[in-house]
Amino acid sequence: MKVEISKDLEDLIPGYLDGIRKTIQDFKDYLSTEDWENLRIHGHRMKGSGGGYGFHFLTEKGKQIEDAAKESDGASIQSAITELDDYLNSVEIEFVESEDW
C-alpha cells in the first residue's frame, strides 16, 4: 500500500511509526490480559493521530480497536492487530510537496 505524506512531516514519520509499532505491541499485551480499558484508550489515540500524519488506515484500525474494546470483542481486536502488522510491513511512503498533499 502506498501513502502520500507531506514532505513537511518527513523528519517526524520514523519516530511516529516507531511509536505505532510500540502501540501495536501494547495492544497485543493488553489483549492477552483482556485489558479493555487500555485497548479503548490507545485505540482512540491511534484513531486521532493517524489521519493527522496521512495514515488514514491507522485511523480506521484505531477506531475498530476502540469500538471493539467497548464490547470486549477480542476477535475483532486481534483482526485489527494482524492488519496493522501487515500494513506496517508493506506500507510504502512517498513524500510530496505540501501543496500536493
Roles of regions detected by a PLM:
Residues 2-3, 7-24, 49, 53-60, ...:
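Amphipathic, coiled-coil-like alpha-helical segments
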Residues 23-71:
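Extended, amphipathic alpha-helices with heptad-repeat/coiled-coil or helix-bundle character
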